[in-house]
Design a protein with these regions (language model features):
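A short core secondary-structure module
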Residues: 96-141
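A short, Trp-centered hydrophobic/proline-enriched beta-strand micro-motif
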Residues: 62-70, 114
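Internal helix-loop-helix
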Residues: 1-63, 103-110
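Flexible, small-/acidic-enriched active-site or ligand-binding loops
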Residues: 81-83, 135-167
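Hydrophobic, small-residue-rich alpha-helical packing segments that form membrane-like cores
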Residues: 75-78, 88, 93
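Short Ser/Thr-interspersed hydrophobic loop/turn segments at strand-loop and sheet-helix junctions
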Residues: 22-26, 115, 132-137, 161-165
Length: 168
């Protein structure tokens, strides 16, 4: 479990190549087996302070599960084309938008969410990453798309409607 996380944080210590081999062989039978080797998103290693205890450590021990949300209708995986926005409002961020093809969101506790927080001087999206609890008001986890080639794999649609999360 958490085989991609460093051993000093309680993970399995596998490097990217070894993890790829594990997932490749599990995937020959069924993507459902990949649940056995559930792995936290590597970006969680950037957590600091209270976020380590709230998100990173419980995800490594299996107490909490995460998913990652970047893909959007109309933009696919083109992050610069994403429409999901996060806007500062006092001591909160307010998030609005839709993500789709989100693996296993229905069994996750929180999402590693990428959203646009403004534009640069050339009009390109500035992106930020947020940790959002999926039981948070303003978050809807909906059934995604049936995938013929992915036995045991479930993807979801995430809708964010005036979802408020505190500035940290």
């Amino acid at each position: 479990y958490a085989c991609n996380m460093p051993t000093e944080h309680g993970g399995g210590g596998l490097n990217a190549f070894d993890l790829t081999l594990v997932e490749k062989h599990l995937g020959f039978a069924s993507l459902a087996l990949a649940e056995v080797a559930w792995r936290p998103q590597n970006i969680l290693m950037a957590c600091e302070g209270e976020l380590i205890d709230e998100y990173l450590k419980p995800t490594i021990t299996g107490e909490r599960k995460d998913c990652i949300a970047m893909t959007e209708p109309g933009a696919g995986s083109d992050l610069r084309g994403m429409k999901t926005k996060a806007v500062k409002d006092g001591n909160d961020w307010v998030i609005n938008g839709t993500k789709h093809f989100i693996s296993n969101a229905h069994i996750s506790d929180f999402v590693v969410l990428f959203a646009s927080t403004g534009e640069d001087d050339k009009g390109r999206n500035l992106l930020s990453c947020f940790l959002v609890d999926l039981k948070q008001k303003g978050v809807e986890v909906a059934k995604g798309y049936d995938c013929v080639s992915h036995r045991g794999y479930v993807n979801n649609i995430l809708n964010f409607n005036d979802c408020k999360i505190p500035l940290r």
